[in-house]
Structures are given as C-alpha cells and as structure tokens.
Swiss-Prot record:
<feature type="glycosylation site" description="N-linked (GlcNAc...) asparagine">
    <location>
        <position position="102"/>
    </location>
</feature>
<keyword id="KW-0964">Secreted</keyword>
<feature type="glycosylation site" description="N-linked (GlcNAc...) asparagine">
    <location>
        <position position="25"/>
    </location>
</feature>
<feature type="glycosylation site" description="N-linked (GlcNAc...) asparagine">
    <location>
        <position position="324"/>
    </location>
</feature>
<dbReference type="InterPro" id="IPR001087">
    <property type="entry name" value="GDSL"/>
</dbReference>
<comment type="similarity">
    <text>Belongs to the 'GDSL' lipolytic enzyme family.</text>
</comment>
<feature type="active site">
    <location>
        <position position="332"/>
    </location>
</feature>
<keyword id="KW-0443">Lipid metabolism</keyword>
<feature type="active site">
    <location>
        <position position="335"/>
    </location>
</feature>
<protein>
    <recommendedName>
        <fullName>GDSL esterase/lipase At2g30220</fullName>
        <ecNumber>3.1.1.-</ecNumber>
    </recommendedName>
</protein>
<keyword id="KW-0325">Glycoprotein</keyword>
<dbReference type="GO" id="GO:0005576">
    <property type="term" value="C:extracellular region"/>
</dbReference>
<dbReference type="GO" id="GO:0016788">
    <property type="term" value="F:hydrolase activity, acting on ester bonds"/>
</dbReference>
<dbReference type="GO" id="GO:0016042">
    <property type="term" value="P:lipid catabolic process"/>
</dbReference>
<dbReference type="Pfam" id="PF00657">
    <property type="entry name" value="Lipase_GDSL"/>
</dbReference>
<keyword id="KW-0732">Signal</keyword>
<dbReference type="InterPro" id="IPR035669">
    <property type="entry name" value="SGNH_plant_lipase-like"/>
</dbReference>
Amino acid sequence: MYISKTIVFGLFVATLLVSCNADANTTQPLFPAILIFGDSTADTGNNNYYSQAVFKANHLPYGVDLPGHEANGRFSNGKLISDVISTKLNIKEFVPPFLQPNISDQDIVTGVCFASAGAGYDDETSLSSKAIPVSQQPSMFKNYIARLKGIVGDKKAMEIINNALVVISAGPNDFILNFYDIPIRRLEYPTIYGYQDFVLKRLDGFVRELYSLGCRNILVGGLPPMGCLPIQLTAKLRTILGICVEQENKDSILYNQKLVKKLPEIQASLPGSKFLYANVYDPVMDMIRNPSKYGFKETKKGCCGTGYLETSFLCTSLSKTCPNHSDHLFWDSIHPSEAAYKYLGNFIDAQIQEWLKT
C-alpha cells in the first residue's frame, strides 16, 4: 500500500511539473499585432495584387525555400525580416499582404503588411517603379482599420492598433533610384546632405500620420551599407574587385546618425508614442567583414544569376541559382537571403527586447 501511494504521489508531482513547464514555455505575444510599411525588404506580396507595379516577386526562384516552394511576392528565397520578427515575437510565422484577396479575419486581427516593392519616402521614387509610395500606404491602413473595427468593434480595434508593433523599412530606393544611379533629385538637391534632410522630413510626416491613426509603438529601420549592395557594385563598376562604394556607405552612416537624433525629437512631440531605431547597418557590415562567422561564403553578389544585376523580372525561373542558398548574404542583386534576414531578425529582436525594458 505504501508503494502504491508513493507511485500515485510521484505521478501527481510529475504531472504537475509537466503542466508548469508547459505553461512556462507558452509565451504570449509581446504585441497583439504587427503592422508593416515600406519597400521590397518588407513587401510580403502586395505588388502581386497591384497591377501597375513594375517590381514583383511572384515567380521562381523567389520563394523557393518557402513551404510549398512557391513564390508569393517576397523578394528573397524565403522569409523576410518582418516574418522573422513576427515569429520571434510570437505573433505569427508569416505576415500576409493587405491586398491579398482572401485574407482571413484572424490575419487582420494579428496584423498585415502594407509595404510595396519599389516604394520610398520620396514620392518621386515610386514614379518609375509604379509602386505604392510610403506616403499612400496609410490609405490602405485606413481601410484595414475599418475592416478591423468590423471584426472586433471600435474599442477593441483601437486597443489593438495602440498596442501593435509598427515596423517601417524604407529608404534605400530613394537614394539609389533618385540620387545615385538616376540622379533626378540632384537637380533640386545638389548635395546628399540636403536630400537626406528632405527624406527625413518625409519620414517625419509619415510617422506622424500613423500616430494620428492610432499607432504608438513604431520601429524605424535605418539604411544598410548601400555601397555594398551588389547592384551598386555593378553601377559603379566594382564587380571585379568587389570593393564597396565607400562614399555611399558614408552617406548611409550619416543618414542613420540623423535618424537616430530625429526619432527622440518626434517621440517627445507625440504623447504616448515610443520609437525604436532599428540598426541594420552594423549587422550587415559585420556579415560582409566576417562572413565565416555567419556561415557565408559569398557576400558581394547575389545567389540568382550572375548576382550583380538580376532582381525582380531579371531574376526568373530561367536564372541559375547558387547550389547552397544559405551561404550567400544576398539572394539577388539587392535583397538579402533568408539566412541573412534570420540573422538580422535576431539582432533586431534583441533591440526590441531591450526597448521594452525602457
């Protein structure tokens, strides 16, 4: 009888411990929803449903490493950084594009993407790419709010938006398309300094509009080392030596410094807001300088085609791809691979965790 009681007691304790451990491992989302704005680094497929858009990733080899091995509009071989962040925060594994026709109510409640490949803060940027400019993405957001209210009611909808994490990833297109490679804006802004200030002013107006619509927790991505993008090595005839365009990297650093200074100023003027600068420059540069640390063998060209020019409609199912997708920093001549996005996502997640402590 004594043995029987001991066994029963032991089973009870074991069951209790398993139950406690299960509860401990069930992490609640840190934010009720995630809302994504920006360009192709964040577009999870909106351009698929926007007929005017020039840049689309609705064909292989884009998406080749996603479940089902099918392209769905993401400019990479797999997940984007927004998907990685959403997963790390326990919100959901994939953030759907708002323009997707069959988007579910549950996806509306937990957040969607409004980004458009080819977009920038400067409306001029979208003229050639026919993308949805960052300045027009709040129009989609307003439609989203209306649908969200129809699902959960006005009060709950605003509660979700107030507490959601807003992620903004844009900027490189403005400088690459309008200042470096097609210098349209140089006529009005002869120096990079003036154009940087113009772009930041546009960013300022954009985040203030999001705030007026209820957004409070806003993460703003800085610029990567633009001079190291394969497309820029091609544009500046650096492909043979593989040397980054140092001046463009210096421009990225200066812009980021200005952004770091500006965000606290914006936050101070918007009661209840909380801004986070997402540093992408340093981790990407570290991947370039220390590739073996991340398992990369190639950091100067993309996996698709030659790696120096192909992107969007130039990177197709007819393009040869590198044998090992995960050993390339870049998937095409502009966009990082899923492997790189995972490292970046982990880096930014650590920033978010520290941000939440403040």
